[in-house]
C-alpha cells in the first residue's frame, strides 16, 4: 500500500481521492521515526488466533484480518468486501486496482471465514442488523462478533 500511496498510482485522481495527504505524510514520518513495520508475506500471523492475509484487488495492499473468536474463525474483510452482494455475485465494487485480485479476494475471504455467517463485510448495513451491540451504549458502533449472526 505504501508503494501505491507514495508512487505513480497517485497521479490518477480516482486513486488519489481515496487518501488524505496528511495521512500519507504521517506514515512517512512514522517510517523515518522507525515506528512503522511492513508485512511482506501473503499471510502474517501477528499473535495466536490473529492473521493478516494479503488479497489485493480494491487497493494494491488490501488485507483481510482473520481472528479466532469464541465461535471459531471469522474474517474482518474491510474494503476487500464492501457488501455481501459482491461475494454472492462476484460483482466488484466500482473502484478497484486489480479486478482479478478483487474477485479472488472475495473467494479467499469466504473460504477463510468458512461461510458467509463468519464473514464481516466492511460497509454492508446487514452487519449492524445481524450482530448486537456489546451494550446499549454502543448501539450500531461496537458489535459482538463472538455470537452467531441473526441473519433473516
Residues of each region from the PLM?
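Metallo-beta-lactamase
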Residues: 1-54, 101-116
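A short catalytic or substrate-binding loop motif that flags glycine-/basic-rich loops and adjacent residues
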Residues: 56-60
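Glycine-rich, charged/polar anion/phosphate-binding loops
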Residues: 51, 61-62
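Cap/insert and terminal regions of metallo-dependent hydrolase folds
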Residues: 62-66, 70-152
Amino acid at each position: 500500500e505504501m508503494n501505491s500511496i507514495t508512487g505513480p498510482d497517485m497521479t490518477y485522481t480516482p486513486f488519489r481521492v481515496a487518501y488524505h495527504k496528511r495521512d500519507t505524510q504521517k506514515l512517512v514520518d512514522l517510517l523515518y521515526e522507525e515506528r512503522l513495520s511492513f508485512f511482506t508475506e501473503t499471510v502474517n500471523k501477528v499473535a495466536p488466533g490473529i492473521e493478516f492475509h494479503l488479497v489485493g484487488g480494491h487497493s494494491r495492499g488490501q488485507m483481510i484480518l482473520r481472528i479466532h473468536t469464541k465461535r471459531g474463525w471469522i474474517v474482518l474483510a474491510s474494503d476487500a468486501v464492501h457488501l455481501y452482494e459482491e461475494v454472492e455475485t462476484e460483482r466488484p465494487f466500482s473502484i478497484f486496482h486489480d479486478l482479478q485480485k478483487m474477485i479472488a479476494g472475495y473467494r479467499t475471504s469466504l473460504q477463510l471465514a468458512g461461510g458467509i455467517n463468519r464473514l464481516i463485510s466492511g460497509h454492508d448495513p446487514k452487519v449492524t442488523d445481524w450482530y448486537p451491540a456489546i451494550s446499549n451504549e454502543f448501539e450500531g458502533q461496537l458489535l459482538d462478533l463472538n455470537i452467531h449472526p441473526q441473519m433473516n
